[in-house]
Amino acid sequence: MIKKIAVLTSGGDAPGMNAAIRGVVRSALAEGLEVFGIYDGYQGLYNNKIKQLNRYSVSDVINRGGTFLGSARFPEFKDPNVRAKCAEILRSHGIDALVVIGGDGSYMGAKLLTEEHGFPCVGLPGTIDNDVAGTDYTIGYQTALQTAVDAIDRLRDTSSSHQRISIVEIMGRHCSDLTISAGIAGGCEYIVASEIEFNREELIQQIERSIIRGKRHAIIAITELLTDVHSLAKEIEARVGHETRATVLGHIQRGGSPCAFDRILASRMGAYAVDLLLQGKGGYCVGIQNEQLVHHDIIDAINNMQRVFKADWLKVAKRLE
């Protein structure tokens, strides 16, 4: 029977992480468990930055963006000796289980602690990219989506005033859920997704045809890392004769107060993680599918499960362009 659990946030921050921490802490305390916060992710664990938390430690955090526990990239965790030391530190505090909030990289760390050291871990999907398998939505995605749509709305105001073409680069790496969803909600004329091969010439020809039909301005939503958007803007302007500007939303998408959906999702997932650990179920990750909370073997989720590309959403977006 577990008596003490710890929680950490790892990788890129996401709105709603604080709500998830709160869900873990207060649910665990309600079950008579002691809870410890690990500051600055796996790096903080390695440096023994561990502090006991109480219910007041998570007061007034549900509405705050970021993560009050802090986060950090820690590639050194790939070293088996580093992981062994981390497991030893956890046990030196009498900690019986760990909740990890983050993306795929964070899950991998939890997987290795479970596999190599038999340490019960539960992963919660915390990333704005929505690129974690086994869940329809990740914590932070809906808030980041609203941030992107708000930016697109503002860009449309100025683009329409100046008959300008605006390119908006949206986060997501190899997952275009944010781009596709923001493109639909923002009424973008063109959406460029990372899952589909990017054809610059085809895009420019589409814009040229739109201008011939009388289009006076346009918004192009594109997933990051596909191309240099500033170079693309110059090429479009030279070819079509319309002023073209690129805006990189960047890390602004990670900040801000989490929306109601993310606060509720994170709170539910945090409580669910504690329930799993109380049932003796370590080595799992939590997701939401068809509005129901679910859990998957974390090893299976990393090695075998594939995130579902929203091809039907992109098809709708293309029809609405």
Swiss-Prot record:
Q: What does this protein do?
A: Catalyzes the phosphorylation of D-fructose 6-phosphate to fructose 1,6-bisphosphate by ATP, the first committing step of glycolysis.
For the keyword Mitochondrion, the answer is no
Q: Where does substrate bind?
A: T127, I128, D129, R164, M171, G172, R173, E224, R245, H251, I252, Q253, R254
Class of the enzyme per the UniProt entry, highest EC level: transferase
Q: How does it assemble?
A: Homotetramer.
Binding annotation for Mg(2+): D104
Q: Which reaction does this enzyme catalyse, per its entry?
A: beta-D-fructose 6-phosphate + ATP = beta-D-fructose 1,6-bisphosphate + ADP + H(+)
Entry binding sites for ADP: 22-26, 55-60, 156, 187-189, 213, 215-217
Record-listed ATP binding positions: G12, R73, F74, G103, D104, G105, S106
Q: Which UniProt keywords apply?
A: Allosteric enzyme, ATP-binding, Cytoplasm, Glycolysis, Kinase, Magnesium, Metal-binding, Nucleotide-binding, Transferase
Among Gene3D superfamilies, the record links this protein to: 3.40.50.450, Phosphofructokinase domain
Q: Which InterPro entries match?
A: ATP_PFK (IPR022953), ATP_PFK_prok-type (IPR012003), PFKA_ATP_prok (IPR012828), Phosphofructokinase_CS (IPR015912), Phosphofructokinase_dom (IPR000023), PKF_sf (IPR035966)
The UniProt note on how this protein's activity is regulated states:
Allosterically activated by ADP and other diphosphonucleosides, and allosterically inhibited by phosphoenolpyruvate.
CDD domains in UniProt: Bacterial_PFK
Q: Which cofactor does it need?
A: Mg(2+)
- Identification of the protein by name: ATP-dependent 6-phosphofructokinase
User: Which source organism?
Assistant: Haemophilus influenzae (strain 86-028NP)
NCBIfam families referenced in this protein's UniProt entry, alphabetically: PFKA_ATP, PRK03202.1
Q: What is its EC number?
A: 2.7.1.11
Q: Where in the cell is it found?
A: Cytoplasm
Q: Which SUPFAM superfamilies match?
A: Phosphofructokinase
- Which one of the record's GO molecular function terms can you name? 6-phosphofructokinase activity
